[in-house]
Amino acid sequence: MFKYQTILSPLDQFEIRNLFSIDTPLLANMNLSITNIGLYMTIAAFIAFYFSILATNHSKITPNKWSLSQETLYATIHSIVVNQINNKNGQAYFPFMYTLFIFILINNLIGMVPYSFASTSHFILTFSLSFTVVLGATVLGFKEHGLKFFSLFVPAGCPLGLLPLLVLIEFISYLARNVSLGLRLAANILSGHMLLNILSGFTYNIMSSGIIFFILGLLPLAFIIAFSGLELGIAFIQSQVFVVLSCSYIKDALELH
């Protein structure tokens, strides 16, 4: 008799599952469902809202610890937006960029909690964010400059003979922003969680094989703990990188360079 053993894939943790669904005959048999990615994004939105409430200082002179943390994030993102765009236009787009940073950061941090779900590891979410940013920047460019916006694809000092080729390259590069912005975020979160899952399973198998192997497994366990700290840093860095590049795209649309 053959014994079958279930093999767990590191990709199982990223599977989108229906948690609750209901058919609505009154709405053309539309199926309404709540998935794990929708649930965790909703949780992230509530956490962001609750964090803002905790950080409200109620006009007190001495700030609380939540106010200090929010002011630190506020000052950091404000500096990034103003430096990337400019003092005048940066103020207008700062609220959107700050909200975008907090949303991505909280989703990244939720993904670090054991047995939770990493929403930002899914390309459907990150590509939706990147497409929205690039499309918004493109619409903004046409609104500000009209057809002159196409001059963005013409490099300065370009020889006339190379103009068609370089314009094509610049246009493809512009379209690639939609993919690269979302791909960078999802790929970093996805690869980090997969590596942690593989190393954790490997370490568990070693440490559960006996007392000697348990002692030997302390070394990879220490590495996993250190790597988890690195993943926390990546959660912050990738949120910041997404905002920096988004600001850069908006600046290109406003200033055509």
Curated annotation (Swiss-Prot):
GO MF annotation terms: proton-transporting ATP synthase activity, rotational mechanism
HAMAP family: ATP_synth_a_bact
Family: Belongs to the ATPase A chain family.
Record's protein name: ATP synthase subunit a
UniProt function note: Mitochondrial membrane ATP synthase (F(1)F(0) ATP synthase or Complex V) produces ATP from ADP in the presence of a proton gradient across the membrane which is generated by electron transport complexes of the respiratory chain. F-type ATPases consist of two structural domains, F(1) - containing the extramembraneous catalytic core and F(0) - containing the membrane proton channel, linked together by a central stalk and a peripheral stalk. During catalysis, ATP synthesis in the catalytic domain of F(1) is coupled via a rotary mechanism of the central stalk subunits to proton translocation.
Localization: Mitochondrion inner membrane
Subunit details: F-type ATPases have 2 components, CF(1) - the catalytic core - and CF(0) - the membrane proton channel. CF(1) has five subunits: alpha(3), beta(3), gamma(1), delta(1), epsilon(1). CF(0) has three main subunits: a, b and c.
Organism, as annotated: Cochliobolus heterostrophus
Keyword tRNA processing: no
Gene3D superfamilies assigned: ATP synthase, F0 complex, subunit A
Annotated membrane topology: Multi-pass membrane protein
UniProt entry keywords in alphabetical sequence: ATP synthesis, CF(0), Hydrogen ion transport, Ion transport, Membrane, Mitochondrion, Mitochondrion inner membrane, Transmembrane, Transmembrane helix, Transport
Domain of life: Eukaryota
